[in-house]
């Protein structure tokens, strides 16, 4: 994200990261500080077995599990490159949410921070404007 958004925009948009204590976050200090020593963000960890402390991000995990069921072979479903990751992200972030009055995360981002949305579009992520075309199933990667 730091590379996609650029340092200034990243610092403005990602002041903190709240996560669990998964093994992927064992080097949190490297995520918090750039190689030049400047502060990138601050990471905070939820208590063990307290996923409710992460708020609505758990709902995103549920959507991700619709596409990538736990224990599935990610390569077998087509998750082999950045393009595949983008397809998953586009579908999850284009999914309308009741909590957002039927809007998607992409639509909210466009409204709250057009410069950030523009950077994601430049990276290759796009909103799926017709919600009927959003696919939250493993075969979404086979349709590319």
Predicted feature residues:
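Active-site beta-loop-alpha junctions of metal-dependent nucleic acid enzymes
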Residues: 1-11
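Charged alpha-helix within mobile-element recombinases
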Residues: 30-34, 40-130, 140-143
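Glycine-centered flexibility motif
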Residues: 6, 22-23, 55, 71
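Acidic/histidine-rich, metal-coordinating catalytic segments
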Residues: 11-27, 47-49
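Short A/G/S/P-biased low-complexity tracts
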Residues: 136-138
